[in-house]
């Protein structure tokens, strides 16, 4: 995956730097801190979206934090772990047009609900199917679960853009940076909580030891 990033980043960055024109800079508008706090406490839709982003970030973060352990310890396929994780993200990228079409058809909030239910169903389906050495199940889970990976964060940010536009219509001020800074915070908090909670539960409740000998109960805790 490291070589993948080293090769693709320059190939993608150079055309952007050469052919995408710079936009004309606009003078910034300072927002008094009192007004900023009023925005934070008065906008209920924003809070609902932040809670949704925190929860979605937590769920996706747990899956991401445990994936390598699942591939190496439970499936005992360490040689597949890194390349499968690469396809996990690649599938999420390629599936995004389908989720966007669904969002246009049923609404962004409903599309996100479908994506979360889909990912939950894939996780539940893994429980009876997972077994050591089963390459088909590992790759099937990776591709199918990865197809929904990008939907929640993308749709949530699209909805936050709508909230930012509504705020501009009501107040006459442009402050998308404030909204998206909060969204970035909840996303990072969700991912951090996911890593801390999942690793702590694995150690205390299941006595899982990374890279060591684990009994079936400890391995089952990964799922």
Where are the model-predicted features located?
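Membrane-embedded alpha-helical bundles of multi-pass transporters/translocases
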Residues: 1-223
């Amino acid at each position: 995956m490291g070589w993948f990033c080293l090769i693709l980043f320059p190939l993608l960055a150079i055309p952007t730097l050469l052919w995408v024109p710079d936009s004309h800079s606009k003078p910034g508008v300072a927002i008094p801190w009192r007004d900023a706090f009023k925005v934070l406490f008065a906008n209920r839709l924003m809070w609902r979206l932040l809670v949704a982003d925190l929860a979605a970030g937590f769920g996706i973060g747990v899956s991401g934090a445990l994936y390598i352990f699942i591939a190496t310890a439970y499936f005992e396929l360490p040689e597949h772990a890194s390349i499968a994780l690469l396809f996990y993200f690649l599938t999420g990228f390629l599936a995004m047009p389908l989720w966007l079409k669904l969002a246009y058809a049923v609404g962004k909030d409903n599309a996100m609900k479908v994506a979360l239910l889909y990912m939950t169903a894939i996780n539940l389906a893994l429980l009876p199917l997972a077994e050591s050495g089963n390459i088909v199940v590992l790759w099937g889970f990776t591709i199918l679960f990865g197809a929904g990976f990008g939907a929640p964060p993308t749709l949530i940010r699209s909805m936050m853009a709508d909230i930012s536009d509504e705020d501009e219509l009501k107040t006459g001020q442009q402050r998308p940076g404030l909204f998206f800074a909060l969204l970035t915070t909840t996303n990072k908090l969700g991912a951090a909580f996911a890593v801390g909670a999942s690793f702590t539960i694995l150690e205390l409740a299941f006595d899982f030891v990374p890279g060591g000998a684990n009994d079936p109960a400890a391995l089952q805790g990964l799922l």
